Protein backbone atom coordinates (compact mmCIF):
# COMPACT_ATOMS: atom_id res chain seq x y z
CA UNK A 1 0.00 0.00 0.00
CA UNK A 2 2.07 2.95 -1.25
CA UNK A 3 -0.72 5.46 -1.98
CA UNK A 4 -0.10 8.93 -0.57
CA UNK A 5 -2.73 10.53 1.72
CA UNK A 6 -3.78 12.82 -1.16
CA UNK A 7 -4.34 9.80 -3.45
CA UNK A 8 -6.29 7.97 -0.72
CA UNK A 9 -8.58 10.99 -0.20
CA UNK A 10 -9.05 11.30 -3.98
CA UNK A 11 -10.11 7.63 -4.14
CA UNK A 12 -12.49 8.04 -1.19
CA UNK A 13 -14.01 11.11 -2.92
CA UNK A 14 -15.19 8.84 -5.75
CA UNK A 15 -17.59 7.13 -3.32
CA UNK A 16 -18.20 9.49 -0.38
CA UNK A 17 -19.35 13.13 -0.49
CA UNK A 18 -17.92 15.65 1.98
CA UNK A 19 -16.44 14.71 5.40
CA UNK A 20 -12.96 15.89 4.39
CA UNK A 21 -11.62 15.91 7.97
CA UNK A 22 -12.49 12.24 8.48
CA UNK A 23 -11.01 11.28 5.11
CA UNK A 24 -7.76 13.10 5.91
CA UNK A 25 -7.50 11.41 9.32
CA UNK A 26 -7.95 7.88 7.96
CA UNK A 27 -5.66 8.59 4.98
CA UNK A 28 -2.85 9.69 7.31
CA UNK A 29 -3.42 6.66 9.57
CA UNK A 30 -3.20 4.33 6.56
CA UNK A 31 -0.10 6.02 5.16
CA UNK A 32 1.58 5.80 8.57
CA UNK A 33 1.28 2.02 8.37
CA UNK A 34 3.32 2.05 5.15
CA UNK A 35 5.83 4.50 6.70
CA UNK A 36 6.21 2.24 9.73
CA UNK A 37 7.06 -0.77 7.53
CA UNK A 38 9.98 1.22 6.03
CA UNK A 39 11.61 1.70 9.47
CA UNK A 40 14.38 -0.50 10.93
CA UNK A 41 12.98 -3.52 12.83
CA UNK A 42 13.82 -2.28 16.35
CA UNK A 43 12.18 1.12 15.77
CA UNK A 44 9.23 -0.40 13.90
CA UNK A 45 8.20 -2.34 17.02
CA UNK A 46 7.94 0.92 18.99
CA UNK A 47 5.64 2.74 16.55
CA UNK A 48 2.00 2.01 17.37
CA UNK A 49 -1.03 3.13 15.33
CA UNK A 50 -2.97 6.21 16.43
CA UNK A 51 -6.51 4.92 16.80
CA UNK A 52 -9.42 7.08 15.62
CA UNK A 53 -12.78 8.05 17.15
CA UNK A 54 -15.36 9.26 14.60
CA UNK A 55 -18.20 11.33 16.02
CA UNK A 56 -21.21 12.16 13.87
CA UNK A 57 -24.91 11.48 13.26
CA UNK A 58 -26.08 8.32 11.53
CA UNK A 59 -25.95 8.11 7.73
CA UNK A 60 -23.16 10.64 7.11
CA UNK A 61 -20.50 8.16 5.95
CA UNK A 62 -18.66 6.85 9.05
CA UNK A 63 -18.98 3.16 8.19
CA UNK A 64 -18.57 3.73 4.45
CA UNK A 65 -15.23 5.54 4.98
CA UNK A 66 -13.86 2.60 7.00
CA UNK A 67 -15.18 0.02 4.50
CA UNK A 68 -13.71 1.79 1.47
CA UNK A 69 -10.44 2.31 3.33
CA UNK A 70 -10.05 -1.42 4.00
CA UNK A 71 -10.73 -2.18 0.34
CA UNK A 72 -8.08 0.35 -0.70
CA UNK A 73 -5.53 -1.02 1.75
CA UNK A 74 -6.27 -4.63 0.75
CA UNK A 75 -6.02 -5.35 4.48
CA UNK A 76 -7.90 -7.72 6.81
CA UNK A 77 -10.93 -5.73 7.93
CA UNK A 78 -13.84 -6.39 10.25
CA UNK A 79 -16.78 -4.22 11.32
CA UNK A 80 -18.42 -5.01 14.65
CA UNK A 81 -21.16 -3.44 16.76
CA UNK A 82 -20.03 -2.58 20.30
CA UNK A 83 -23.50 -3.49 21.61
CA UNK A 84 -23.08 -7.16 20.56
CA UNK A 85 -20.50 -7.82 23.27
CA UNK A 86 -20.77 -8.43 27.00
CA UNK A 87 -18.11 -8.36 29.68
CA UNK A 88 -16.44 -11.61 30.71
CA UNK A 89 -18.73 -13.59 33.02
CA UNK A 90 -21.98 -12.52 31.32
CA UNK A 91 -23.78 -14.57 28.66
CA UNK A 92 -22.77 -13.34 25.20
CA UNK A 93 -19.71 -12.81 23.04
CA UNK A 94 -16.52 -11.55 24.61
CA UNK A 95 -14.42 -8.89 22.87
CA UNK A 96 -11.56 -11.30 22.03
CA UNK A 97 -13.85 -12.86 19.39
CA UNK A 98 -13.26 -9.63 17.38
CA UNK A 99 -9.64 -10.68 16.79
CA UNK A 100 -10.66 -14.28 16.05
CA UNK A 101 -13.10 -13.01 13.41
CA UNK A 102 -10.39 -10.72 12.02
CA UNK A 103 -8.06 -13.74 11.70
CA UNK A 104 -10.78 -15.65 9.80
CA UNK A 105 -11.27 -12.65 7.49
CA UNK A 106 -7.51 -12.54 6.79
CA UNK A 107 -7.39 -16.26 5.90
CA UNK A 108 -10.43 -15.90 3.60
CA UNK A 109 -8.96 -12.82 1.87
CA UNK A 110 -5.53 -14.39 1.28
CA UNK A 111 -7.01 -17.74 0.19
CA UNK A 112 -9.07 -15.96 -2.49
CA UNK A 113 -5.93 -14.17 -3.70
CA UNK A 114 -3.92 -17.43 -3.82
CA UNK A 115 -6.70 -19.29 -5.64
CA UNK A 116 -6.75 -16.47 -8.19
CA UNK A 117 -2.98 -16.91 -8.72
CA UNK A 118 -3.21 -20.68 -9.37
CA UNK A 119 -6.43 -20.39 -11.42
CA UNK A 120 -4.84 -21.30 -14.78
CA UNK A 121 -2.87 -24.24 -13.36
CA UNK A 122 -6.06 -25.51 -11.72
CA UNK A 123 -7.97 -25.18 -15.03
CA UNK A 124 -5.29 -27.19 -16.87
CA UNK A 125 -5.31 -29.93 -14.21
CA UNK A 126 -9.12 -30.07 -14.26
CA UNK A 127 -9.12 -30.32 -18.06
CA UNK A 128 -6.72 -33.29 -17.95
CA UNK A 129 -8.86 -35.11 -15.38
CA UNK A 130 -12.00 -34.61 -17.48
CA UNK A 131 -10.20 -35.89 -20.60
CA UNK A 132 -8.99 -38.94 -18.63
CA UNK A 133 -12.62 -39.69 -17.74
CA UNK A 134 -13.83 -39.14 -21.32
CA UNK A 135 -11.15 -41.22 -23.03
CA UNK A 136 -9.77 -44.68 -22.22
CA UNK A 137 -6.11 -44.85 -21.21
CA UNK A 138 -3.60 -44.84 -24.05
CA UNK A 139 -2.85 -48.34 -25.38
CA UNK A 140 0.77 -49.43 -25.02
CA UNK A 141 2.66 -49.25 -28.30
CA UNK A 142 3.26 -52.76 -29.69
CA UNK A 143 5.23 -53.94 -32.67
CA UNK A 144 6.83 -51.40 -34.89
CA UNK A 145 6.52 -47.65 -34.29
CA UNK A 146 4.19 -45.85 -31.91
CA UNK A 147 1.20 -45.38 -34.21
CA UNK A 148 -1.53 -46.21 -31.60
CA UNK A 149 -0.04 -43.74 -29.09
CA UNK A 150 0.03 -41.00 -31.73
CA UNK A 151 -3.53 -41.81 -32.74
CA UNK A 152 -4.61 -41.62 -29.09
CA UNK A 153 -2.88 -38.26 -28.72
CA UNK A 154 -4.73 -36.91 -31.78
CA UNK A 155 -8.06 -38.08 -30.34
CA UNK A 156 -7.23 -36.39 -27.03
CA UNK A 157 -6.46 -33.09 -28.80
CA UNK A 158 -9.74 -33.33 -30.70
CA UNK A 159 -11.67 -33.89 -27.45
CA UNK A 160 -9.73 -31.06 -25.77
CA UNK A 161 -10.81 -28.68 -28.57
CA UNK A 162 -14.46 -29.77 -28.25
CA UNK A 163 -14.27 -29.43 -24.45
CA UNK A 164 -12.95 -25.86 -24.68
CA UNK A 165 -15.65 -24.94 -27.21
CA UNK A 166 -18.34 -26.23 -24.83
CA UNK A 167 -19.58 -28.98 -27.16
CA UNK A 168 -19.27 -31.62 -24.41
CA UNK A 169 -20.89 -29.59 -21.60
CA UNK A 170 -24.08 -31.69 -21.45
CA UNK A 171 -22.36 -35.09 -21.69
CA UNK A 172 -22.50 -37.11 -18.44
CA UNK A 173 -19.36 -38.74 -17.05
CA UNK A 174 -18.35 -40.72 -13.95
CA UNK A 175 -15.69 -38.76 -12.12
CA UNK A 176 -13.88 -39.22 -8.80
CA UNK A 177 -14.17 -36.13 -6.60
CA UNK A 178 -13.44 -35.28 -2.97
CA UNK A 179 -16.16 -36.45 -0.60
CA UNK A 180 -17.48 -33.37 1.16
CA UNK A 181 -20.19 -34.52 3.56
CA UNK A 182 -22.85 -32.05 4.64
CA UNK A 183 -21.41 -29.71 7.27
CA UNK A 184 -22.14 -30.65 10.86
CA UNK A 185 -24.27 -27.95 12.46
CA UNK A 186 -23.55 -27.57 16.16
CA UNK A 187 -25.90 -25.42 18.20
CA UNK A 188 -23.98 -23.74 20.99
CA UNK A 189 -24.89 -21.01 23.47
CA UNK A 190 -23.50 -17.48 22.90
CA UNK A 191 -19.86 -17.14 23.83
CA UNK A 192 -19.01 -20.76 22.91
CA UNK A 193 -18.14 -20.09 19.24
CA UNK A 194 -14.52 -21.15 19.73
CA UNK A 195 -15.54 -24.61 20.98
CA UNK A 196 -18.06 -24.92 18.12
CA UNK A 197 -15.35 -24.11 15.54
CA UNK A 198 -12.98 -26.68 17.02
CA UNK A 199 -15.64 -29.41 16.92
CA UNK A 200 -16.55 -28.56 13.31
CA UNK A 201 -12.86 -28.67 12.31
CA UNK A 202 -12.55 -32.07 14.03
CA UNK A 203 -15.51 -33.53 12.10
CA UNK A 204 -14.39 -32.05 8.76
CA UNK A 205 -10.84 -33.38 9.35
CA UNK A 206 -12.18 -36.92 9.78
CA UNK A 207 -13.51 -37.00 6.20
CA UNK A 208 -10.50 -35.23 4.61
CA UNK A 209 -8.88 -37.11 1.73
CA UNK A 210 -11.85 -39.40 1.09
CA UNK A 211 -13.00 -39.71 -2.53
CA UNK A 212 -16.21 -40.83 -4.14
CA UNK A 213 -17.37 -41.37 -7.71
CA UNK A 214 -20.20 -39.17 -8.94
CA UNK A 215 -22.11 -38.97 -12.23
CA UNK A 216 -22.00 -35.36 -13.39
CA UNK A 217 -22.36 -33.30 -16.54
CA UNK A 218 -19.00 -32.21 -17.96
CA UNK A 219 -19.60 -28.49 -17.30
CA UNK A 220 -20.51 -29.20 -13.66
CA UNK A 221 -17.60 -31.63 -13.17
CA UNK A 222 -15.13 -29.14 -14.69
CA UNK A 223 -16.11 -26.42 -12.19
CA UNK A 224 -16.03 -28.84 -9.24
CA UNK A 225 -12.60 -30.25 -10.13
CA UNK A 226 -11.20 -26.80 -10.91
CA UNK A 227 -12.12 -25.62 -7.39
CA UNK A 228 -10.73 -28.85 -5.89
CA UNK A 229 -7.42 -28.51 -7.77
CA UNK A 230 -7.08 -24.82 -6.82
CA UNK A 231 -7.49 -25.65 -3.11
CA UNK A 232 -4.93 -28.46 -3.45
CA UNK A 233 -2.38 -26.10 -5.07
CA UNK A 234 -2.61 -23.57 -2.20
CA UNK A 235 0.00 -24.08 0.53
CA UNK A 236 -2.12 -23.94 3.70
CA UNK A 237 0.78 -23.62 6.16
CA UNK A 238 2.32 -20.72 4.26
CA UNK A 239 -1.13 -19.16 3.91
CA UNK A 240 -1.70 -19.25 7.68
CA UNK A 241 1.72 -17.72 8.39
CA UNK A 242 1.01 -14.87 5.95
CA UNK A 243 -2.49 -14.38 7.37
CA UNK A 244 -1.06 -14.10 10.89
CA UNK A 245 1.39 -11.42 9.74
CA UNK A 246 -1.36 -9.59 7.81
CA UNK A 247 -3.61 -9.47 10.90
CA UNK A 248 -0.85 -8.26 13.22
CA UNK A 249 0.70 -5.67 10.88
CA UNK A 250 -2.19 -4.48 8.68
CA UNK A 251 -5.46 -5.47 10.42
CA UNK A 252 -8.21 -2.84 10.73
CA UNK A 253 -11.07 -3.15 13.25
CA UNK A 254 -14.07 -0.83 12.95
CA UNK A 255 -16.13 -0.67 16.16
CA UNK A 256 -19.51 0.93 15.47
CA UNK A 257 -22.08 2.20 18.00
CA UNK A 258 -19.41 2.80 20.66
CA UNK A 259 -21.60 5.57 22.11
CA UNK A 260 -24.17 2.92 23.13
CA UNK A 261 -21.73 1.46 25.68
CA UNK A 262 -20.83 4.87 27.14
CA UNK A 263 -22.08 5.33 30.71
CA UNK A 264 -24.63 8.15 30.77
CA UNK A 265 -24.97 10.43 33.75
CA UNK A 266 -27.65 9.44 36.32
CA UNK A 267 -28.25 6.06 34.66
CA UNK A 268 -28.07 2.70 36.37
CA UNK A 269 -29.02 -0.92 35.73
CA UNK A 270 -27.33 -2.40 32.67
CA UNK A 271 -24.66 0.31 32.65
CA UNK A 272 -22.44 -1.86 34.88
CA UNK A 273 -22.10 -4.37 32.05
CA UNK A 274 -21.59 -1.55 29.51
CA UNK A 275 -18.63 -0.22 31.45
CA UNK A 276 -17.34 -3.78 31.69
CA UNK A 277 -17.29 -4.02 27.87
CA UNK A 278 -15.28 -0.78 27.71
CA UNK A 279 -12.77 -2.16 30.22
CA UNK A 280 -12.51 -5.42 28.22
CA UNK A 281 -11.78 -3.37 25.08
CA UNK A 282 -8.88 -1.54 26.79
CA UNK A 283 -6.23 -4.31 26.62
CA UNK A 284 -7.33 -5.20 23.07
CA UNK A 285 -6.78 -1.63 21.83
CA UNK A 286 -3.67 -1.05 23.96
CA UNK A 287 -2.06 -4.30 22.80
CA UNK A 288 -2.44 -7.84 24.11
CA UNK A 289 -2.18 -11.42 22.82
CA UNK A 290 -5.27 -13.34 21.69
CA UNK A 291 -5.42 -17.06 20.95
CA UNK A 292 -6.87 -17.77 17.47
CA UNK A 293 -6.88 -20.56 14.86
CA UNK A 294 -3.71 -19.03 13.40
CA UNK A 295 -1.93 -19.09 16.76
CA UNK A 296 -1.26 -16.23 19.15
CA UNK A 297 -2.11 -12.84 17.60
CA UNK A 298 -0.58 -9.66 19.03
CA UNK A 299 -2.93 -6.69 18.74
CA UNK A 300 -0.27 -3.98 19.29
CA UNK A 301 -0.27 -2.78 15.67
CA UNK A 302 -3.90 -3.37 14.68
CA UNK A 303 -5.65 -0.09 13.78
CA UNK A 304 -8.91 0.47 15.69
CA UNK A 305 -11.48 2.95 14.35
CA UNK A 306 -14.42 3.55 16.70
CA UNK A 307 -17.53 5.49 15.75
CA UNK A 308 -20.74 6.68 17.32
CA UNK A 309 -23.47 9.28 16.97
CA UNK A 310 -23.21 10.39 20.64
CA UNK A 311 -26.79 11.75 20.68
CA UNK A 312 -27.55 10.75 24.27
CA UNK A 313 -23.99 10.63 25.57
CA UNK A 314 -20.67 12.42 25.03
CA UNK A 315 -17.20 11.06 24.21
CA UNK A 316 -16.21 12.14 27.74
CA UNK A 317 -18.72 9.57 29.09
CA UNK A 318 -16.40 6.78 27.93
CA UNK A 319 -14.03 5.53 30.63
CA UNK A 320 -10.93 7.80 30.68
CA UNK A 321 -8.53 4.97 29.76
CA UNK A 322 -10.52 4.21 26.59
CA UNK A 323 -10.60 7.90 25.64
CA UNK A 324 -6.81 7.93 25.90
CA UNK A 325 -6.51 4.96 23.56
CA UNK A 326 -8.52 6.77 20.85
CA UNK A 327 -6.33 9.89 20.50
CA UNK A 328 -7.52 11.13 17.09
CA UNK A 329 -11.01 12.69 17.23
CA UNK A 330 -12.86 13.46 14.02
CA UNK A 331 -16.26 15.12 13.88
CA UNK A 332 -18.43 14.35 10.87
CA UNK A 333 -20.93 17.02 9.89
CA UNK A 334 -24.64 16.56 9.27
CA UNK A 335 -25.57 16.62 5.57
CA UNK A 336 -26.88 19.78 3.89
CA UNK A 337 -29.32 19.94 0.91
CA UNK A 338 -26.31 20.55 -1.35
CA UNK A 339 -24.65 17.37 0.01
CA UNK A 340 -27.79 15.36 -0.75
CA UNK A 341 -27.79 16.75 -4.29
CA UNK A 342 -24.16 15.70 -4.80
CA UNK A 343 -24.78 12.24 -3.26
CA UNK A 344 -27.49 11.61 -5.86
CA UNK A 345 -25.23 12.34 -8.83
CA UNK A 346 -21.48 12.51 -8.12
CA UNK A 347 -20.27 9.22 -6.56
CA UNK A 348 -19.19 6.27 -8.67
CA UNK A 349 -22.36 4.12 -9.08
CA UNK A 350 -24.56 6.86 -7.59
CA UNK A 351 -28.15 6.11 -6.56
CA UNK A 352 -29.67 7.72 -9.67
CA UNK A 353 -27.32 5.74 -11.92
CA UNK A 354 -28.23 2.50 -10.13
CA UNK A 355 -31.97 3.02 -10.67
CA UNK A 356 -31.39 4.10 -14.28
CA UNK A 357 -29.43 0.92 -15.06
CA UNK A 358 -31.85 -1.35 -13.15
CA UNK A 359 -34.82 -0.13 -15.20
CA UNK A 360 -32.80 -0.26 -18.42
CA UNK A 361 -32.75 -4.08 -18.03
CA UNK A 362 -36.54 -3.95 -18.65
CA UNK A 363 -36.03 -1.76 -21.72
CA UNK A 364 -37.32 1.33 -19.88
CA UNK A 365 -35.29 4.55 -19.94
CA UNK A 366 -35.60 7.13 -17.16
CA UNK A 367 -33.85 10.47 -16.96
CA UNK A 368 -33.32 12.58 -13.84
CA UNK A 369 -33.65 16.31 -14.55
CA UNK A 370 -31.49 18.74 -12.59
CA UNK A 371 -34.50 20.42 -10.94
CA UNK A 372 -35.88 16.97 -10.02
CA UNK A 373 -32.66 16.04 -8.22
CA UNK A 374 -32.61 19.43 -6.47
CA UNK A 375 -36.20 19.00 -5.25
CA UNK A 376 -35.51 15.43 -4.09
CA UNK A 377 -32.49 16.65 -2.09
CA UNK A 378 -34.60 19.42 -0.49
CA UNK A 379 -37.30 16.95 0.55
CA UNK A 380 -34.71 14.55 2.02
CA UNK A 381 -33.23 17.37 4.09
CA UNK A 382 -36.66 18.65 5.21
CA UNK A 383 -37.88 15.22 6.33
CA UNK A 384 -34.62 14.63 8.22
CA UNK A 385 -35.02 17.98 10.00
CA UNK A 386 -38.69 17.43 10.89
CA UNK A 387 -38.41 13.79 11.97
CA UNK A 388 -35.39 11.63 12.82
CA UNK A 389 -32.16 12.56 11.05
CA UNK A 390 -30.99 9.35 9.35
CA UNK A 391 -28.62 11.08 6.94
CA UNK A 392 -28.12 9.81 3.39
CA UNK A 393 -30.18 6.69 4.10
CA UNK A 394 -33.27 8.90 3.73
CA UNK A 395 -32.55 9.06 -0.01
CA UNK A 396 -33.06 5.29 -0.35
CA UNK A 397 -36.53 5.61 1.21
CA UNK A 398 -37.48 8.59 -0.97
CA UNK A 399 -36.24 7.07 -4.24
CA UNK A 400 -38.05 3.78 -3.59
CA UNK A 401 -41.25 5.70 -2.92
CA UNK A 402 -40.74 8.01 -5.91
CA UNK A 403 -40.10 5.19 -8.40
CA UNK A 404 -42.46 2.61 -6.90
CA UNK A 405 -45.07 2.87 -9.68
CA UNK A 406 -42.42 2.95 -12.44
CA UNK A 407 -40.63 -0.11 -10.99
CA UNK A 408 -43.90 -2.04 -10.65
CA UNK A 409 -45.09 -1.33 -14.21
CA UNK A 410 -41.67 -1.17 -15.92
CA UNK A 411 -42.40 -3.95 -18.44
CA UNK A 412 -45.69 -2.29 -19.55
CA UNK A 413 -44.24 1.23 -19.59
CA UNK A 414 -41.27 0.13 -21.74
CA UNK A 415 -43.49 -0.31 -24.83
CA UNK A 416 -45.31 3.01 -24.23
CA UNK A 417 -42.07 5.00 -23.76
CA UNK A 418 -39.88 3.25 -26.32
CA UNK A 419 -39.13 6.50 -28.18
CA UNK A 420 -38.36 8.82 -25.21
CA UNK A 421 -37.34 8.36 -21.55
CA UNK A 422 -39.55 9.07 -18.53
CA UNK A 423 -38.40 12.41 -17.13
CA UNK A 424 -38.09 12.72 -13.35
CA UNK A 425 -38.32 16.50 -12.89
CA UNK A 426 -39.43 18.76 -10.02
CA UNK A 427 -43.09 18.40 -11.06
CA UNK A 428 -42.87 14.60 -11.02
CA UNK A 429 -41.17 14.65 -7.58
CA UNK A 430 -43.78 17.05 -6.14
CA UNK A 431 -46.70 15.01 -7.46
CA UNK A 432 -45.34 11.80 -5.89
CA UNK A 433 -43.68 13.09 -2.70
CA UNK A 434 -44.74 16.72 -2.12
CA UNK A 435 -47.88 15.99 -0.09
CA UNK A 436 -46.13 13.36 2.04
CA UNK A 437 -43.19 15.67 2.74
CA UNK A 438 -45.45 18.58 3.80
CA UNK A 439 -47.58 16.49 6.18
CA UNK A 440 -45.31 15.84 9.17
CA UNK A 441 -47.45 12.99 10.56
CA UNK A 442 -47.48 11.18 7.22
CA UNK A 443 -43.75 11.66 6.59
CA UNK A 444 -42.97 10.35 10.08
CA UNK A 445 -44.59 7.01 9.19
CA UNK A 446 -44.05 6.71 5.44
CA UNK A 447 -40.79 8.51 4.61
Curated annotation (Swiss-Prot):
UniProt main location, coarse: cytoplasm
Molecular-function GO terms, alphabetical: ATP binding; ATP hydrolysis activity; peptidase activity; proteasome-activating activity
Subcellular location: Cytoplasm
Keyword rRNA-binding: no
CDD domains the UniProt entry points to: RecA-like_HslU
Keywords from the UniProt entry: ATP-binding, Chaperone, Cytoplasm, Nucleotide-binding, Stress response
One Gene Ontology CC term in the entry: HslUV protease complex
InterPro entries according to UniProt: AAA+_ATPase, ATP-dep_Clp_protease_ClpX, ATPase_AAA_core, Clp_ATPase_C, HslU, P-loop_NTPase
SMART domains: AAA (SM00382), ClpB_D2-small (SM01086)
Positions annotated to bind ATP: 17, 59-64, 256, 321, 393
UniProt keyword DNA-binding, yes or no: no
Matches recorded under Pfam families: AAA, AAA_2
Domain of life: Bacteria
Sequence similarity: Belongs to the ClpX chaperone family. HslU subfamily.
Biological role: ATPase subunit of a proteasome-like degradation complex; this subunit has chaperone activity. The binding of ATP and its subsequent hydrolysis by HslU are essential for unfolding of protein substrates subsequently hydrolyzed by HslV. HslU recognizes the N-terminal part of its protein substrates and unfolds these before they are guided to HslV for hydrolysis.
PANTHER family named among the record's database cross-references: ATP-DEPENDENT CLP PROTEASE ATP-BINDING SUBUNIT CLPX-LIKE, MITOCHONDRIAL-RELATED, ATP-DEPENDENT PROTEASE ATPASE SUBUNIT HSLU
NCBIfam families hit by this protein: hslU, PRK05201.1
Assembly behavior: A double ring-shaped homohexamer of HslV is capped on each side by a ring-shaped HslU homohexamer. The assembly of the HslU/HslV complex is dependent on binding of ATP.
UniProt-recorded name of the protein: ATP-dependent protease ATPase subunit HslU
Organism listed in the record: Pseudomonas aeruginosa (strain LESB58)
Amino acid sequence: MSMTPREIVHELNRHIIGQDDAKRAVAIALRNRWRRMQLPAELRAEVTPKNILMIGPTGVGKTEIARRLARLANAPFIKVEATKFTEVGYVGRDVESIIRDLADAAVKMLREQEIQKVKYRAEDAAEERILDALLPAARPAMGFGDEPAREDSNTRQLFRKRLREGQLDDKEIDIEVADNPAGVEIMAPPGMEEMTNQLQNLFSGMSKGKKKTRKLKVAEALKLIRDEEAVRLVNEEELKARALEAVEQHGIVFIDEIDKIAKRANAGGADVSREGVQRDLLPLIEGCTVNTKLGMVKTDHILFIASGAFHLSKPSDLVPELQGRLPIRVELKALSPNDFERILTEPHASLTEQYRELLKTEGLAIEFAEDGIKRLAEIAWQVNEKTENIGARRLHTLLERLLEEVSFSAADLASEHSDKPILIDAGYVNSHLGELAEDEDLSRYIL
